[in-house]
Regions:
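Residue-level marker of beta-strand positions
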Residues: 59, 79-80, 94, 120, ...
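Glycine-rich cofactor phosphate-binding loops and adjacent beta1-alpha1 units
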Residues: 156, 203-280, 320
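Mid-domain Rossmann-like dinucleotide-binding core that forms the NAD(H)/NADP(H) cofactor-binding site
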Residues: 135-213, 218
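C-terminal hydrophobic helical "lid"/dimerization subdomain
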Residues: 243-247, 289-341
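NAD(P)H dinucleotide-binding glycine-rich loop of Rossmann-like/cofactor-binding domains
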Residues: 89-167
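N-terminal glycine-rich cofactor-binding segment
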Residues: 4-21, 36-66, 82-83, 100-114
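Residues in the short beta-alpha loop(s) of Rossmann-like NAD(P)-binding domains
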Residues: 193, 261, 287
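Glycine-rich beta-strand-centered segment in the early N-terminal region that forms part
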Residues: 20-34, 47-93, 127, 132-135
């Protein structure tokens, strides 16, 4: 089978490898689509290292090709599925306490890490989520990032009729926006890119703000009777977004640092302010199985529309260009189409 393999930093190549052999309790899935996420980009550039060579890809969809003889879930060959490819061990402290997104072994080489850039993959039945014919394989490939947004919103304990500010309107910001609207929030979106603000408006944002040209704090305070927003999610890695969040949050407000910062900036607040205001600062990383289940349903129900976020489709023959396109600020998501050659 074909697979796009990252062999070293800034080097990805198409290799012919043996398809995986499934165990009696596993499924063989033919991959249809896989998103090129920030994780794949960081593996490609060497910013993040798991091991080399590695078949990346964790935002995937496909069709069941073979079912192991001991599988008891009733799933059949031909079933269309969304795939949960960042697997958990199910045995460590975090898995056993409901925080499988913190699994100590999720990037253990023995766990068949990732793999969505291959034509086929062997998975456990718990890793597949059936999808109806009403959604495409391309849409189903967004289940994983939508699940991460659901986890993020749970971390700030977003309530009905609260005000939420999303800092950054890239693909994750747009998916956060739609998931938050499902929860009954009034959503503000801040981003200096006019095209991204326009997309957020089309997807239902109450108000979009250009933080480079407008007074973010003044606008937020105006629309919240001087309080500030109840919650803020930072999806942009820009330091100015992190700094601004603490100026627009209300007393008892919650901030989720969703994005990662490899330069590890200090949080721009102090212990006494947190003490006096009861503000909560948290982060979120990945998602759990339940988050993934909910994400699939939101896409199927049409509550989260990911189609506008598909910026380009790439193939094995164009994988290098696809990687470069995925890293451009002009794109939302680039998908690898594994059936297109």
């Amino acid at each position: 089978m074909k697979a796009a393999v990252i062999t070293s930093p800034n080097r990805i190549e198409i290799q012919e490898i043996d398809p995986p052999e499934i165990k009696a309790n596993e499924l063989l899935v033919k991959i249809k689509n896989c998103g090129i996420c920030t994780l794949e980009q960081r593996l490609y550039t060497g910013e993040m290292k798991i091991y080399y060579p590695i078949i990346p890809g964790h935002e995937a969809s496909g069709e069941v090709a073979e079912v192991g003889k001991d599988v008891i879930s009733g799933i059949k060959p031909g079933t269309r599925v969304a795939l949960d490819l960042v697997i958990r061990c199910g045995e460590c402290y975090y898995c056993r306490t409901g925080h499988s997104n913190m699994c100590l072994n999720r990037f253990n080489r023995g766990n068949r890490v990732l793999g969505g850039f291959g034509e086929y993959i062997a998975v456990k039945p718990a890793q597949v989520f059936s999808i109806p014919d009403s959604i495409s394989f391309q849409e189903a490939a967004f289940a994983e990032p939508v699940a991460c947004c659901i986890r993020s919103l749970k971390k700030i304990n977003l309530h009905l009729a609260e005000d939420l500010l999303i800092m950054g309107a890239g693909s994750m910001g747009q998916m956060h926006l739609q998931a938050a609207l499902c929860m009954g929030a009034r959503v503000f979106v801040s981003d200096p890119d006019g095209r991204r603000r326009t997309m957020a408006e089309k997807l239902g944002a109450f108000l979009t703000i250009d933080p480079a040209r407008e007074d973010l704090e003044k606008i937020i305070k105006h629309h919240t009777d001087g309080r500030g927003v109840d919650a803020c999610i930072i999806t942009s890695p820009a330091h100015v977004a992190l700094n601004s969040a603490f100026n627009v949050i209300s007393k008892t407000g919650r901030i989720n640092i969703y994005t990662s910062y490899h330069d590890k900036p200090a949080i721009p607040t102090d212990a006494n302010t947190i003490h006096r205001t009861e503000q909560v600062v948290t982060g979120s990383e990945g998602r759990t199985e339940f988050d993934f289940f909910q994400a699939v349903r939101l896409i199927v129900f049409g509550k989260v529309d990911v189609k506008p976020l598909i910026s380009a489709i790439t193939t094995y023959a164009q994988i290098e260009a696809g990687m470069q396109a995925a890293m451009s600020k002009d794109t939302y998501r680039v998908l690898l189409d594994n059936k297109a050659g």
